[in-house]
Amino acid sequence: MKTLTTYAKYFTPISKIAFLFCFLMGNIAEATIKRAKFTNGFSGINRIITYTFEGSSTMIASATTPEQILFSKARDNTVIDPSYSNNVQQWSVFNNWIDTTVSGDTGYSFAGFSCVSNPCAQMQLPLRFYLDSAILEATSMRSADNQVIFKIRQHPELGVSFQLGMKKGIEDVKWLSNLQQEDFLLTTLQIYFGDAADISFKVRAKLHLLKLPTENTELPTMKLNLGQIKLQSWGINNWGRTKVSYRVQDVGSLNVQLKTPKIYFIQQQRQCILNSTYKKIPVTLKSVKKREFETNTEIEGGQFKLRVNCEDTTYNKFNGKWLFPVVKVTFRGEDGTMNDGTNELLRTQTGTGQATGVSLKIKRDSGNGDSVKYGLDSANMNNHGQFELKKQPSPAGGDQSAEETFKVYYVKDTTRGALTEGKVKAAATFTMSYQ
């Protein structure tokens, strides 16, 4: 008999400690730009032209999504683990941004800045960010994109990492890295007199769970003060033939505030159930003739299906909303199979009566002929060889299962010796991962 046996070696929901919750991205709406006050003075016979930004104001980035249901998603990093978040009807994967509207003063205007010298000097304006250390406390942790994670003092179970984006005129937004734990230089603005440039800012952030919740809770919308942007003073003396001095100064500040959506903390881990009949799956392969390999390098021998049920509302539903995990699987080959995440040949057993010169290949129902690549039996996210089952659970139509059908092929494999007749038997384990 020709058989391929697959085993469910691991069946565990994944739990880690820290999770990335959501992204917030700012768009300019109901926004204004700070404008400078012009003064013309003298120091003795020397003329001094000064542009001063006055007053402190606040830029508020408010999430347009009223609430987020947040739950764990494993990652190989045990401290900073990203998670999926689910709105009412669609997934919000951690690489997507949740839109916000930005109101208040959102930047600086350099319209009206002029000089009487020839040539005019270029302004070199350092722009710094000052962390609100009364609200945020720097940690040694970094987000997946290497941004510092700050603990929110009022809610120590939560952390936030963020970036400020800068937009000059009609140019695209340039996101500025935050690699420092305290105050840091954002960038140095290079502005020419007379170019009427407006500099506006955006904010994007990620929230991180720093402590595993012991129960389901919710956190109301927060107005989270991140810190303040401040333009550093710049000046140049006795410029050009006219010997005029120029000054630019900011005697106020631009406070940055993040208004989060309502956050639901989900204590239970999402999971699915593997039907007992799938825990050990013998796959009987059809017999093939040795001569068939004279014209074929691989021949279909049989098929099998993997299916898990995710309909348990205890784990996968909250406040009437389904919180389905993404169901992934890794196959690990036995009998000396190379499990490095790139190999797609499953070694067959050797010995008396066993065929030689042949291996097996398991092909996916992906529509493009993908083959299973064998990896270690780990449920960790991004495990080598891990892939997402073709059909995922969905609230639509009442089908809360994940499944895929696989086909098994004989493959002529010269690395296994000359092709001889005999039995073909192999085994592989599969590890389900609920992410």
From Swiss-Prot:
GO biological process: cell adhesion involved in single-species biofilm formation
Keyword terms of this UniProt record: Fimbrium, Signal
Chief site of localization: other
Pfam families: Fimbrial
Family matches, as InterPro entries: Adhesion_dom_fimbrial, Adhesion_dom_fimbrial_sf, Adhesion_dom_sf, Bact_Fimbrial_Adh_Pro
Localization terms from the record: Fimbrium
Record family assignment: Belongs to the fimbrial protein family.
Protein name in UniProt: Minor fimbrial subunit HifE
UniProt source species: Haemophilus influenzae
